[in-house]
Amino acid sequence: MDEVELYVYYKLARRDAKRLREIAARFPQVRLLLKDDGSSSDPPTWMEIHTGPLAETGERAMAAALEGLIAGTRHVERFRPA
């Protein structure tokens, strides 16, 4: 089975950004991005990119760790090599 890449995006209040970065640091396979659209809206949109053989396991663990912090829905999109 091909490895997947998971692209996860959600809203998270700026006041929780430090906690998000601390949680993400526990997952070496994840990249954490902040949407840069020139807006100062709160809450901003964050994106996680999970890659490698532990992408799905890491995504589930990170979702559990972030429970209660995210404002609204956590959107997960799956991609595989073409």
Regions found by a protein language model. Name each.
Residues 61-67:
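Large eukaryotic, non-enzymatic subunits of multiprotein complexes that serve as scaffolds/tethers
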Residues 1-61, 73-82:
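Short S/T/G/P-rich N-terminal loop/turn motif that feeds into the first structured element of a domain
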